[in-house]
Each structure stands twice: as structure tokens, then as C-alpha cells.
Amino acid sequence: MRIKKYIVGVATSVCMCLLLFSIDVHGSEALPTAGFYADLESIEPAEPIYILTEEEQLLLKQIGVHEAGEMDVEGIAHVMQVVLNRCEDERFPDTVSEVLFQKHQFTTAKQLARMKTTEAADEALSDVMFGEYTHNEALYFESMKGKVWSRIHTYQFSYGGHDFYK
């Protein structure tokens, strides 16, 4: 899971090289910086930022569908991202399986073996693996208002009837 930080570092280095190359090629000419930076935001990484086993991918799709309920691709992806955020946080276990089956955490995880996945879950997993939701830094979420535990965490955002916390 620590590969994400490495890839971000490599991507930053590549962008700096491209910028320096552009300066060298254009010399004293004005650089098309506005278009250059706008184009960078639309570039998707060629490799996933998360390297997951087939079992981890299946578990993420199952928990995403189950916990997100009737939510769309984005809602499923937010749930998946919470699990991956926990894998990268030192306060939690390091693997998807360990995070999901950690005592008193994902209480529905015991039912995952019976859960079916959906095309929306496939799309959400692809989006998450390629860094589409890394802005979601949440470690917790809940779908019911008024739970005491959520009051001790920092609110991040709401989506599809779920509140996400850090």
C-alpha cells in the first residue's frame, strides 16, 4: 500500500522533467503554461496506484456494494477508498482482509462470502485503483445519524446518505 507515495513521487519527478524539457526546447519563447497544466490534470496514470490481489479486489467490491447499498459508482468507490486509507494508516492493519475483519469494525464483513458484486463495483474499483478518489482521506463512515463514535472523529463529507470522517 505504500506504493502510492512512491508513484506520486515518480509522477512529480516526471512532470518536472517535462517542464524543464519544455523550457529548454522553447528557449526564450513564451511557454503555453495554462494549457500545459490543464492537460496534466486530465492524464490518468498508466499503472494502478494500488497493487491488490484478486482476493483483495473481490473483498473491496463486495464490501463496497454491501455498505454503499443503493449508491452509485462514486458511493461504492468512497467506501472502498476508506478501506484502502485504513491499510495505509499505521493505526490499522496493512491488508484489505485484515482491515475488513478487524474486530468491531466492518460488522457486515462476515457476510461477504455470500455477497455478489456488480458492474458498478467493477467500475468503482478501477477508479479507486487508478487514484480517482485519493482526495477522500476518510477512515470511517456511517449511514445512520447520531452514533456516538462519529462525534470523536473529524467530519470530511457526506455522500449518498453516508457521512465520512477522518
Per-segment meaning from a language model:
Residues 33-166:
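Bacterial extracytoplasmic/cell-wall-associated proteins, especially those involved in peptidoglycan
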